[in-house]
Swiss-Prot record:
One of its GO terms (molecular function) is CoA-disulfide reductase (NADPH) activity. The keyword Endoplasmic reticulum does not apply. GO terms for cellular component: cytoplasm. It comes from Pyrococcus furiosus (strain ATCC 43587 / DSM 3638 / JCM 8422 / Vc1). Catalyzes the CoA-dependent reduction of elemental sulfur (S(0)) to produce hydrogen sulfide. Can use both NADPH and NADH, but shows a preference for NADPH. May enable S(0) to be used, via sulfide, for iron-sulfur cluster synthesis by SipA. Also shows coenzyme A disulfide reductase (CoADR) activity with both NADH and NADPH. However, CoADR specific activity is about 20-fold lower than the sulfur reduction assay and CoADR activity appears to be an artifactual side reaction and is not thought to have any physiological relevance. Also shows NAD(P)H oxidase activity with both NADH and NADPH. Disulfide bonds: none annotated. Gene3D superfamilies: FAD/NAD(P)-binding domain (3.50.50.60). This is NAD(P)H sulfur oxidoreductase (CoA-dependent).
């Protein structure tokens, strides 16, 4: 295969995974990555922990730029914004100049951007998003220069809860405002969110079913106005969701899928020849339903980049799709899921049965055991496990086990007879996941 030119737009997880994979398989190829910020291979999921003060901002880059440039031979351009895409070339604004670069293969890995509500005051000093590493730097610097006691977070998703924990841990008075009637409404059923909300109310002012009308202040933010009240604010975090950055792809005529993200096939190819997409900008299929979904999560993004890079370099491999496996926490309460919730399964047309159990993470006689709640969703016709949600303590092994089981097509009987490890310091003899399968019946 002759030497090719590969251009990758975006130097985050998906982009650098794609670039690294191409260079590993085709070290003689010219691989260029254009990243609009000065951060490469960054970890946005770490932003709350930088703000909390338990992680240094420098660690938000998995590898420094020198690793990709010197060790992997990638032509990495930082602070380089791609402003135009045409067949065979991209136009880049870099160091105050514009320059064109040719490509034989193109990868869109330019991620997603925060959805900012159209309300007055979002541009006031002291109002932030928590989407990229520069946001973590800006928030911490603002707190160092200004007295911050009252923090308002607009949103009730993962980022909102994680940022809330960061500020609560730092001793701030936190108000969490959401338009919906439940936190985490899109990803968890009510049995789970009821427990989460009870925990939140122990540590902050939770305001649900309130629409934010404006953010007000003179020289900087001072308060947030909703249709239900007025809340003092020295700092505001807007965490109302994200949207895929598809504008550049549209310039090239790339198909945008029904989810609003770039359509891709199993090889991460788009509708345009030799053009790929990976990460938060791309949609994929759901492992259970086979339908198109946009679930922007880091593990899948990395794998999408790996698959795109492999196929570009001639090593065919397919991305099988996602389950939406995810986990977060608020203080000492862990929250996670994999597969379909009951609400999602019913919307997809499944006849389901469910079970919701409370268990302990260790035998009653062994110290250190804590409560865990699990909800299982099963196809009533086939007994196939469709989804598991968990809240409480030590949920990770249960969620990860369930993800593997769902991927493999396990029924409740298969789950029940899975030979899980047991010893009193680690788990009860009847693991909560096995108990869940028993209650779901087979």
């Amino acid at each position: 295969m002759e030497k090719k030119k590969v251009v990758i737009i975006g130097g985050g997880a998906a982009g650098m995974s794609a670039a690294s994979r191409v260079k590993r398989l085709r070290p003689e190829w010219d691989v260029k990555v254009f990243e609009a910020t000065e951060w490469v291979s960054h970890a946005p999921c770490g932003i709350p922990y930088v703000v909390e003060g338990i992680a240094p901002k420098e660690k938000l880059m998995h590898y420094p730029p020198e690793v990709f440039i010197k060790k992997r031979g990638i032509d990495l351009h930082l602070k380089a914004e791609v402003i135009e895409v045409e067949t065979g070339y991209v136009r880049v604004r870099e160091n105050g100049e514009e320059k064109s670069y040719e490509w034989d293969y193109l990868v869109f890995a330019n991620g997603a951007s925060p959805q900012i509500p159209e309300i007055e005051g979002v541009d006031l000093p002291g109002v932030f998003t928590a989407d990229l590493p520069p946001d973590a730097v800006a928030i911490t610097e603002y707190m160092e220069k200004n007295k911050v006691e009252d923090v308002v977070i607009i949103g009730t998703g993962y980022i909102a809860l994680e940022m809330a924990e960061a500020f609560v841990t730092r001793g701030k008075n936190v108000t969490l405002i959401g338009r919906s009637e439940r936190v985490l409404r899109k990803t968890f059923d009510k049995e789970i969110t009821d427990i989460v909300e009870e925990k939140l109310r122990q540590h902050l002012n939770l305001r649900l079913h309130e629409k934010t009308l404006s953010i007000e202040g003179r020289e900087r933010v001072e308060k947030v106005i909703t249709d239900g009240g007025e809340y003092k604010a020295d700092l505001v975090i807007i965490a109302t969701g994200i949207k895929p950055n598809v504008e550049l792809a549209k310039q090239l005529g790339v198909k945008i899928g029904e989810t609003g993200a770039i359509w891709t096939n199993e090889k991460m190819q788009t509708s345009v020849e030799n053009v790929y997409a990976a990460g938060d900008v791309a949609e994929t299929k759901h492992v259970i339903t086979g339908k198109r979904v946009w679930i922007p999560l880091a593990p899948a993004g990395n794998k999408m980049g790996y698959v795109a890079g492999s196929n570009i370099a001639g090593k065919e491999i397919e991305f099988p799709g996602v389950l939406g496996t995810s986990i977060t926490k608020f203080m000492d309460l862990e929250i996670g899921k994999t597969g379909l919730t009951e609400n999602e399964a019913v919307k997809e047309g499944y006849d389901v049965r469910t079970a919701f159990i409370k268990a302990n993470t260790k035998p009653h006689y062994y110290p250190g055991g804590r409560e865990i709640w699990l909800k299982g969703v099963v196809d009533n016709e086939t007994n196939r496990l469709l989804g598991v949600q968990a809240v409480g303590a030590e949920i990770l092994p249960r969620i990860d086990s369930a993800a593997a089981m769902i991927t493999a097509g396990f029924t409740t009987k298969d789950v029940f007879f899975t030979d899980l490890a047991y010893a009193p310091p680690f788990a009860p003899v009847w693991d909560p996941l096995i108990v869940l399968a028993r209650v779901l019946k087979f």
